Amino acid sequence: MLNMVGSVLASGKNESFKLQYRVVAQDSLASAMMLGLANEDTAFIFDKVENNKKKTASGRPTWASLVQLSDYSVRGIDATTNPFCAAGTTLGNGSYIVVGGNSAISYGGINVKNSDGSMNLNGPAPPYNDMDGRRVVRMMQPNADSSKLKWIDDFDSPNQMDSPRWYPAIEGLADGSVVMIGGATSGGFINRNYPNVDPVYATSSSNPKAGVWDQGGANPVSYTHLRAHET
């Protein structure tokens, strides 16, 4: 983990301000796919599901951690669903919200199969025991006590989104709620070598809808189709 610090370099009568990085922690326990401020003394890190060495209390690899900015100590916290390529922002009440992500995965980011040969997209998927994150709305509520900071991350929550979103966009609104826009229905990249005959739905792999989440935690509402334009 790096911290940017400023130093004043004297050169004759002129002084210049130089920014430089210094290492403050050798191991953040998880890669910072997402990084934010949870309170005045704590930063949160959110990674995709992968086989990080440090395990949490649940036995899963750590893909979420907290960093104390006073001494740069790091501790892992539990997360349940796969937030790979999710979107996040701050609600008007100070909570941090992370929506969408990828399906449950195994080694190498691949999906596993059920005993009947069907794909196990929901999870839990061995060896990480992760759950599908594509419809999940995760929340970290503000708390001055860093020991009480945690992710509300429930695969089967009644407050999940109405449809799956991988790589969506999210934007805060003036009333403190957020709008969630678009995304794909599952993770992955398709480099087409043929015309896109379905620019709106991309033959079921696109989610051309917008949804609104209010800061009280109501289920996403006001879904409308978006127009997709291609040249």
How does the language model describe each region?
Residues 16-24, 71-80, 140-161, 202-223:
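Blade-edge beta-strand/turn elements of extracellular beta-propeller
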Residues 24-59, 84-86:
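Beta-strand-rich domains and repeat architectures in extracellular enzymes and scaffolds
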Residues 41-76, 109-117, 129:
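Beta-propeller domains
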Residues 62-68, 132-144, 194-210:
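Beta-propeller blade signature
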Residues 38-40, 91-93, 172-175:
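Residue-level detector of Asp-centered blade-edge/turn motifs that repeat once per structural unit
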Residues 71-109, 114-123:
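Blade-loop segments of beta-propeller domains
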Residues 224-231:
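Conserved small/polar residues in nucleotide/adenosyl-binding loops
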